[in-house]
């Protein structure tokens, strides 16, 4: 009988870090390692960059990351404590920042998929298999699997989610100093009531995404749109859901963070 990959593995989300390693361990046993996890932060924000991280965790270094979990379930303090540990113990990691203008130009989904491809391509160690959080990532030169709720089911995805979240939060704090009055340090660019009030008072800044209807509504001086605040405008071509890729000449000028653990 022909074997297929990945194997049918039971993911026990309540099993702590050991449960999160089940799928990765099965892939390693099948000779498909190293296994990279990839995740993004900032899809739903109406301001600030979309941040994508890829991370490879070594099987022998997991004990140092006992507190690892989905970044959304961790406090800011816990994420900040985990961030340097992940950078230290990861076999490799790479973080890509996609500016708001590029998100507007290509659409959130296309930008997200391209960011995942670029994050994986930027790893110092070539993975044998890639696990992504929920989204299929076409165009990778190695096999991959989208895992629904992956940041709570696979340790490498959880690590990538922490890297992306902390990296983006730090950028938003810095942008708060560059663009005072919007409260970026507090809401991180998401559409909170405080952000909406500041946006109405000050108007959009260069960090806002004009493909989001609440930003466009303020920019145009119109308040008659019936599309929910903080969502991409479905009437706008930039809100497409296709899986297109950018040409080489149109890759966004992004900031990057790359690392490889010492001794690997």
Swiss-Prot record:
Gene3D superfamilies: Ribonuclease H-like superfamily/Ribonuclease H. Its main location: cytoplasm. GO terms for cellular component: cytoplasm; ribonuclease H2 complex. One of its GO terms (biological process) is mismatch repair. It comes from the Bacteria. The keyword Hydrolase applies. One of its GO terms (molecular function) is RNA binding. PROSITE patterns: RNASE_H_2. Its cofactor is Mn(2+); Mg(2+). A divalent metal cation binds at residues 39-40, 133. InterPro entries: RNase_HII, RNase_HII/HIII, RNase_HII/HIII_dom, RNaseH-like_sf, RNaseH_sf. It catalyses: Endonucleolytic cleavage to 5'-phosphomonoester. Its EC number is 3.1.26.4. Keywords: Cytoplasm, Endonuclease, Hydrolase, Manganese, Metal-binding, Nuclease. Residues 222-264 are annotated as: Disordered. Manganese or magnesium. Binds 1 divalent metal ion per monomer in the absence of substrate. May bind a second metal ion after substrate binding. Belongs to the RNase HII family. Endonuclease that specifically degrades the RNA of RNA-DNA hybrids. This is Ribonuclease HII. It comes from Mycobacterium bovis (strain ATCC BAA-935 / AF2122/97). The gene is rnhB.
